[in-house]
Amino acid sequence: MKTVFFLLLATYLALHPGAALQCYSCTAQMNNRDCLNVQNCSLDQHSCFTSRIRAIGLVTVISKGCSSQCEDDSENYYLGKKNITCCYSDLCNVNGAHTLKPPTTLGLLTVLCSLLLWGSSRL
């Protein structure tokens, strides 16, 4: 009985895909419409990234994909700017915008509600 159980378990694990992250992926594209290829990330890649390099305010080059160690970054250069954004859910790098994590969103909503209540009580 144990043998059958382990055989079924091994078959299930072999056939069942892991819960890998999916990110949009492209290299050196001029706009987001050209960055709609979906990439299945490896299990050690826990974030999606979008890299935008804007040169002289005229040309923007976009790259997207999976990353194992992503850090938001922004650097200004003499002739342009580089901006890297990271996110952590399936297909979250659709346009490179930051997505607020739930604790951040909850904190902002709490502050906003407090300000609204405080302001209405002073009227």
UniProtKB/Swiss-Prot annotation:
What SMART domains does the record tag this protein with? LU
Q: Where is the lipid attached (GPI-anchor amidated asparagine)?
A: 95
Q: Where does the protein principally reside? A: membrane
Listed under GO biological process in this entry are: negative regulation of ERK1 and ERK2 cascade
Instruction: Name the source's superkingdom.
Output: Eukaryota
Is the Cell membrane keyword given for this protein? yes
Q: Which organism is this protein's natural source? A: Mus musculus
Keyword Lipoprotein assigned: yes
| Protein's cellular compartments | Cell membrane
A molecular function GO annotation: acetylcholine receptor binding
Positions of glycan attachment: 40
Keywords in UniProt for this one? Cell membrane, Disulfide bond, Glycoprotein, GPI-anchor, Lipoprotein, Membrane, Signal
What the entry lists under Gene3D superfamilies is as follows: CD59 (2.10.60.10)
Which positions does the propeptide occupy? 96-123
**Membrane-related topology note:** Lipid-anchor; GPI-anchor
Every UPAR/Ly6 domain range: 21-95
Q: What is this protein's record name?
A: Prostate stem cell antigen
> What does UniProt give as the signal peptide span?
1-20
Q: Its function?
A: May be involved in the regulation of cell proliferation. May act as a modulator of nicotinic acetylcholine receptors (nAChRs) activity. In vitro inhibits nicotine-induced signaling probably implicating alpha-3:beta-2- or alpha-7-containing nAChRs.
Please list the tissues where expression of this protein has been recorded.
Predominantly expressed in prostate. Also found in spleen, liver, lung, prostate, kidney and testis. Expressed in brain cortex; expression is increased in transgenic mouse model of Alzheimer disease (at protein level).
